[in-house]
Amino acid sequence: LEMFSATPELVLFGGQIQEWDPSFTRCFGRRTVPTSHPQILEFAQSRNPFNGPSVAFQRVRVLSLGGYPLVGANEDYALWASIMASGHVTANHAEDLVFMRGGEDLVARRSTQRYRRGEEEALKFIYRTGLWSFSRFALHWLTKQLIRRLPDSWNRYIYRNLRQTIPAQVPLIYEKAHSAWNTFQL
């Protein structure tokens, strides 16, 4: 929240994340996103430039844009696109702000027909914001439709390789919380 006080024009701020198995014993990887606004705008042409669980935004400014769009999937990405296309300043912190549980079931959820339809709605919304050209939209649509139809094992491989592999190092805050919880349960 210090960033919003120090930079009043900042509307959206996020950071890096690490994804872990449910027991926090195996790290799936780190999703790294760009930190500066120009880098974020460039990255947004190919991938989501924010890690949703790490994001904070100025509510009043987001509501002035209409709030979260009513799309069937990727609502966060559609909102970020609306913010960026409106010319608002965005940034990401270079450090890991979230250590989250992830899992292989994410791939299966993203392979459903319902998810594909929702994702298509989100892609159309992002195109309508003006963030993407039609050719960029078409490339995203085609790529995502093809990937979502691949076998889950192929999608898991693709998903894993989009994450930066890092050594498994349980976050200190988790160790403290886990220790406190075990003490409480006794």
Q: At which residue positions do the language-model features occur?
A:
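Generic N-terminal initiation segments characterized by hydrophobic and/or small/turn-forming residues
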Residues: 7-9, 25, 183
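A short, conserved acidic/glycine-rich loop-to-beta-strand motif
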Residues: 7-17
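Acidic/proline-rich low-complexity IDRs
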Residues: 9-11, 64, 185
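Conserved nucleotide-sugar donor-binding catalytic segment
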Residues: 15, 21-23, 27-113
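C-terminal subregions of glycosyltransferases and related glycan-biosynthesis enzymes
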Residues: 72-73, 78, 85-186
